[in-house]
Amino acid sequence: MNEEQRIFYNELRKIQDFAIGTSLGKQSKYKKIEDLLEDITYDVIYMICEMIDGYRNDLLQYDVVNVKSGNVINDKIALHDWCEEYLKCTDI
């Protein structure tokens, strides 16, 4: 594994640790497990999109390329800006 790959996976680990810690701290506020899981997955996806967009670590910013078409799906947009429109989360 090269240094850039280590940085990538370390950042994913930070995201995972944050999501676990946050969800454990708020677990009692949820009436349904589905709502808790919805928020955990939303947070993780949002933070991964932030990482791709270059907002979580100054050393990381990526283009997401569809290798079949060659199109860059994050061309001229920030992926994390679209999470709220497409993904579910609660107000807890």
What spans do the regions from the language model cover?
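N-terminal low-complexity, intrinsically disordered segments
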Residues: 1-32, 54, 58-66
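Short, flexible helical or helix-coil boundary motifs
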Residues: 19-23, 40, 44, 56, ...
